[in-house]
């Protein structure tokens, strides 16, 4: 066996506790990715989830034993029972009957981040963190590396349009993943390259204070080993401040820090790896002019995904891919072929001159970025004469979590006001219990644009179809089941009389 084959076999080997695993909540974005990698590496996997889903069906097709509903008997889906039970920090209550049964049987209960950290061992790890943009940046990095001939393992929070999956066990030495800060789990990982897209107040239900939330990124940067690289966005005050705080001590340990951003950046606290000169929207993508810190002239990058924030995400991915040894021209070609991520400004369809998109945005800054990209799109089309009238942006927003809605209701209102017309649904509570007085109306009251509070989702399709005109862009937005409304809106548009373009 040659060295390459031996290395691949060593990276594929599973530790004893991960050879037969039961996963509680197996259909979730993070958990299903872990399950896919375990199955690819020869593990046996069982699991449970509250409902059937596309992810559950895909895992069954790959050999996982999955039960819908939660009960103690699910731990017997694998002959001999599991060697470990895997769960997440927040989504699964400790009273879950499968977790109770695992404790009764003395079966180790592992948290998802610890399992992902174990799967990364023996790899060169490229991790993307930040309050916003993790999934898109991670996905761009994966697609760029694949185009360059690498076969990285990866685990990402959304489904790559190119790969049709959110996780993969590759033959190469590189492992690319999101480092989720929401519950502090990014401190389980030891990155060789770390990207921080931005740092802004979030997840205060877990951290309790802005200071504690910010500190987790400092601690994450400190986990970089000698010879590693930290990539930070200099346009974002939070990540720029991170570079100022940790840059000197990382340099003492032989860790480089590179920044990316736009503008002059003359007072940047760290070397500028790449600078965005300009962004020009085009249809559902755009053209970026950028310049590397070690090159004398600008280059052009044509993206198929919209928004200036996506151009910055692409430049972060470019720096990380270069650090992995990929060829620059090939990286650019790979980024230009990036087709997006499931539920990230995803095109759903077009009817009667109205385009419908879907996006996962569930924080005010994310909402602002997506609506800004949509506004730039319709404005550019009007300048180009592509439409007989300038289209409007109509957003259907579903707040996610009662705690987040209570904290950010005013900020959500301000961000949503960037749209021309707003429909606000009630809160998608997910794991949380309802809070008195916290609902969609609380957000709607803070919107200054024309706004409609609609607590009945069954009426949204027809309502939005009645609001939209040819040339308009409709975006369903949120981390809950608002994603199901796109097809209903298209049905409503299809049923009404035909208009001009």
Swiss-Prot record:
EC number(s) stated in the UniProt entry for this protein: 6.3.2.8
Reactions listed under catalytic activity: UDP-N-acetyl-alpha-D-muramate + L-alanine + ATP = UDP-N-acetyl-alpha-D-muramoyl-L-alanine + ADP + phosphate + H(+)
Keyword Cell cycle: yes
GO biological process, one term: regulation of cell shape
Residue sites binding ATP per the record: 130-136
Predominant location category: cytoplasm
First-tier enzyme category under EC: ligase
Family, as annotated: Belongs to the MurCDEF family.
Protein's UniProt name: UDP-N-acetylmuramate--L-alanine ligase
């Amino acid at each position: 066996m040659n060295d390459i084959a031996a290395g691949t076999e060593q990276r594929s080997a599973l530790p004893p506790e991960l050879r037969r695993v039961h996963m509680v909540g197996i259909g979730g974005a993070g958990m299903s990715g872990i399950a896919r990698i375990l199955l690819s590496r020869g593990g046996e996997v069982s699991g449970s989830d509250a409902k059937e889903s596309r992810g559950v069906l895909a895992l069954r097709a790959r050999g996982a034993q999955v039960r819908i509903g939660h009960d103690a008997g699910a731990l017997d889906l694998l002959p001999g029972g599991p060697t470990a039970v895997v769960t997440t920090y927040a989504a699964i209550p400790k009273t879950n009957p499968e977790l109770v049964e695992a404790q009764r049987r003395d079966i180790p209960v592992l948290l998802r981040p610890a399992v992902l950290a174990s799967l990364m061992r023996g790899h060169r790890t490229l991790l993307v963190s930040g309050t916003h943009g993790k999934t898109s940046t991670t996905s761009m990095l994966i697609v760029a590396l694949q185009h360059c001939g690498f076969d990285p393992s990866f685990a990402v929070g959304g489904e790559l349009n190119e790969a049709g999956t959110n996780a993969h066990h590759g033959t190469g030495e590189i492992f690319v993943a999101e480092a989720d800060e929401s519950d502090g789990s990014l401190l389980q990982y030891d990155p060789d390259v770390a990207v921080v897209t931005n740092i802004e107040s979030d997840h205060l239900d877990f951290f309790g204070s802005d200071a504690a939330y910010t500190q987790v990124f400092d601690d994450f940067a400190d986990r970089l080993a000698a010879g590693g690289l930290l990539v930070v966005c200099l346009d974002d005050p939070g990540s720029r401040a991170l570079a100022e705080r940790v840059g000197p001590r990382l340099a003492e340990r032989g860790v480089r820090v590179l920044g990316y951003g736009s503008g002059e950046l003359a007072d940047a606290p760290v070397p500028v790896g790449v600078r965005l000169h300009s962004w020009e929207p085009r249809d559902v993508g755009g053209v970026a002019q950028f310049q590397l810190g070690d090159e004398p002239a600008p280059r052009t990058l044509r993206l198929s995904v919209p928004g200036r924030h996506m151009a910055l995400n692409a430049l972060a991915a470019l720096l990380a891919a270069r650090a992995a040894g990929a060829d620059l021209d090939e990286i650019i070609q790979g980024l230009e072929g990036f087709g997006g991520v499931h539920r990230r400004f995803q095109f759903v369809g077009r009817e009667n001159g109205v385009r419908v998109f879907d996006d996962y945005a569930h924080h005010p800054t994310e909402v602002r970025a997506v609506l800004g990209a949509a506004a730039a799109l319709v404005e550019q089309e009007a300048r180009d004469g592509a439409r007989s009238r300038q289209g409007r942006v109509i957003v259907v927003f579903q707040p996610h979590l009662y705690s987040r809605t209570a904290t950010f209701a005013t900020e959500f209102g301000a961000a949503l006001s960037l749209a021309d017309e707003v429909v606000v649904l009630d809160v998608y509570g997910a794991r949380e219990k309802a809070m008195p007085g916290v609902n969609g109306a609380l957000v709607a009251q803070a919107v200054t644009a024309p706004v409609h509070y609609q607590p009945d989702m069954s009426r949204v399709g027809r309502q939005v179809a009645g609001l939209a005109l040819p040339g308009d862009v409709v975006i369903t937005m949120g981390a809950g089941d608002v994603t199901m409304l796109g097809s209903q809106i298209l049905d409503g548009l299809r049923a009404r009389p035909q208009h001009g373009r």
